[in-house]
């Protein structure tokens, strides 16, 4: 038995200079797992609660000492002596101990850090890589895939201080033969984009996720400069590289309207979906995330009707990695893909359940980082171990983003042909 003998929590820093929770789980025999909870900027209202201290005299109220104390106190006491390989049991113990719908007693950041640390300790005990242990927990042992990266090379919205409304403009190197080649293509496009922006006298400073954040006059201008960079880097848009958007539309949804202040345009729900559809007709955009507000379910039904057969429509704030909300979406034919973020739901077991539910319903699952990250690269193993097929982990700079790409390189080196890179086939509506 992989007996837990100690659980340790501590306050560490994330990529935005804010505190977050790191946990260690120690087993008999000297096996240790360590993991850290990420943190989001544009968050869905139904996400599990990230517990912050609120003490303005420390870290402007963003300290996590209460969550850390929950790890070192009640969570530790409940897990000592338990089997780290029994992931579902451990997670349920913590969920029951918390006793709230959104984990606001112990904090999703406390529970998640321990949940992931336990999985890492169990993998070490079993003498296998984390992705292999995750595949076993998922009921899909030995079934792997390298994910197509959605590389966020140009930022707007909540991730940048500029006048672009859409939050993320991403490239997907779908024409690559393997992940290693996909990463190289993305890096070359990223560096070429820097030259293009510099040549136009635009800012080349980067946002939270490592993408550039220039002051462009419209969202269409953002797509145009990316097109220029892709072609200048020697790639064909639509064949070698496709585009993806994260609108984070809840951030500019006001009084039932979509207010694109950067463009000076206001749309009603159907009008904004029509606007997005027009962009997909001008550029090879194959995936749109949070194209409407999380509460605009009628609008989502219309968007799915007009684009769902050919464009991947990803619910992030819409579904918040929650099986209850995803069930409603599936039953009503809303969207066709779910973004998977550990900390929206707060445990590994619940995350795996959301991925399985999505796949069973014919939805795709896109594994994602948060804008506030650490060097923790667990999502790379999650993407491969569940054969999810797609990952969002930022741009090609900032070590908090690159850590995930580097882990994927290591995994591909280990697995070789056992983890195929399927390119466009992984994206809903493109197979």
Swiss-Prot record:
Binding residue positions for Mg(2+): 246, 289, 316
GO molecular function, one term: magnesium ion binding
Top-level EC class: lyase
InterPro entries on file: Enolase, Enolase-like_C_sf, Enolase-like_N, Enolase_C, Enolase_CS, Enolase_N
Catalytic residues (positions): 209 (proton donor), 341 (proton acceptor)
Pathway the protein acts in: Carbohydrate degradation; glycolysis; pyruvate from D-glyceraldehyde 3-phosphate: step 4/5
Keywords from the UniProt entry: Cytoplasm, Glycolysis, Lyase, Magnesium, Metal-binding, Secreted
One GO CC term, this protein: extracellular region
Keyword Transferase in annotation: no
Principal localisation: cytoplasm
Named cofactor requirement(s): Mg(2+)
GO biological process, one term: glycolytic process
EC number: 4.2.1.11
Binding-site list for (2R)-2-phosphoglycerate: 167, 341, 370-371, 392
Compartment(s): Cytoplasm; Secreted; Cell surface
Gene3D superfamilies assigned to the protein according to its UniProt record, in alphabetical order: Enolase-like C-terminal domain, Enolase-like, N-terminal domain
Classification via CDD domains: enolase
Catalytic activity: (2R)-2-phosphoglycerate = phosphoenolpyruvate + H2O
Textual note on the cofactor: Binds a second Mg(2+) ion via substrate during catalysis.
Keyword Methyltransferase appears in the UniProt entry: no
Family the UniProt entry places it in: Belongs to the enolase family.
Quaternary context: Component of the RNA degradosome, a multiprotein complex involved in RNA processing and mRNA degradation.
Reported function: Catalyzes the reversible conversion of 2-phosphoglycerate (2-PG) into phosphoenolpyruvate (PEP). It is essential for the degradation of carbohydrates via glycolysis.
Protein name, as recorded: Enolase
